[in-house]
Each structure stands twice: as C-alpha cells, then as structure tokens.
C-alpha cells in the first residue's frame, strides 16, 4: 500500500498502474498481481489502508472520538495523497461505498447535534482543501478549529 500511495502522491492518480506500483515496491508485477489482481483491487486496498490508518490515529488520541476526529480531519499531512486518491476513486465510484460505511460509523459516535455539526464542518473544510478552495482565512484557522473542538465536546 505504501508503494501505491507513493506513486499516487508523487505522480498523480493517472500514474497509478500495477507496473508503476510493482516498480516502486521492488517486486515483480506477478507478485503484485497475486495480492491485487486488478487496479481496482489495488485502489480498494489503498483506500482501506488509509481509512484504517486514520481510525488508528484517532484511536491513539487521548481525546474522545469526535474531538480527535475534528483534530485529525482538519489536517492533510499526506502531501497531496488524498487529492490523488479522490481522483482515482472517480474512476471506481463503487468503492465510495467503503467511505460511506466508515462515515456512518464515525458519525454514529456523535452524541449531540453540536458534535455532529463539528464533524460535518470538519469534513466540509477537508473537502474544500481537497479542491484547493481556501474557505477560512489563515488568521482565523485557529479560532475556527477551537470553535469546532468546543462543539465536539460531548455533554
């Protein structure tokens, strides 16, 4: 998954091929095909890998789930990976069901309307960032994150 992620991050979604991933991983294409019989299977594996990594990072936080979600969701330290992954998913919209299922589980963690609003706002900010739209002026970023964290506090 790291090799596929690196190809996608470095060269963009269009460059993600089984050949490029095998080269990056230093394995034969046949070896890669044993684990991922198609590009779609590779994309699914990469998606599941990153969703799981996000959940594990939240799980390591000492904060309650929703507060950790807001903190983790407001930052994409992946160097453009999520933009590229989004582009790849456009080719395989059936894989969005994986994201929908995870999102349902995550949103179910919200115990109040305010907490849910904080999560939805976090997702909106993340999506705006994916599209390269700056919706929060830099001087207000901390204040907005602070307010979302206040909303995320469970009663």
Could you tell me what each predicted segment is?
Residues 56-97, 108, 112-113:
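Helical hydrophobic small-molecule/effector-binding pocket
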Residues 6-41:
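Helix-turn-helix
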Residues 1, 22, 27-28, 112-115, ...:
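Hydrophobic alpha-helical segments
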Residues 2-6, 10, 24, 41-72, ...:
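Alpha-helical structural segments
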Residues 31-32, 46, 125:
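Gly/Ser/Thr-rich helix-start
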Residues 93-155:
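Hydrophobic/aromatic-rich alpha-helical bundle segments in the mid-to-C-terminal region
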Residues 13, 59, 130-134:
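Short, flexible helix-adjacent loops and helix caps
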């Amino acid at each position: 998954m790291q090799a596929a992620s690196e190809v996608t991050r470095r060269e963009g979604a269009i460059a993600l091929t089984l050949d490029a991933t095998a080269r990056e991983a230093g394995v034969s294409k046949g070896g890669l095909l044993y684990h991922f019989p198609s590009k779609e299977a590779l994309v699914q594996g990469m998606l599941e890998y990153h969703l799981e990594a996000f959940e594990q990072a939240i799980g390591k936080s000492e904060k309650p789930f929703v507060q950790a979600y807001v903190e983790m969701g407001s930052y994409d330290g992946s160097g453009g990976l999520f933009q590229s992954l989004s582009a790849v998913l456009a080719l395989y919209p059936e894989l969005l069901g994986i994201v929908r299922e995870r999102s349902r589980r995550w949103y179910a963690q919200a115990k109040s309307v305010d907490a849910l609003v904080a999560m939805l706002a976090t997702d909106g900010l993340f999506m705006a960032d994916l599209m390269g739209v700056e919706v929060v002026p830099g001087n207000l970023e901390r204040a907005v994150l602070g307010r979302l964290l206040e909303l995320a506090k469970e009663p």
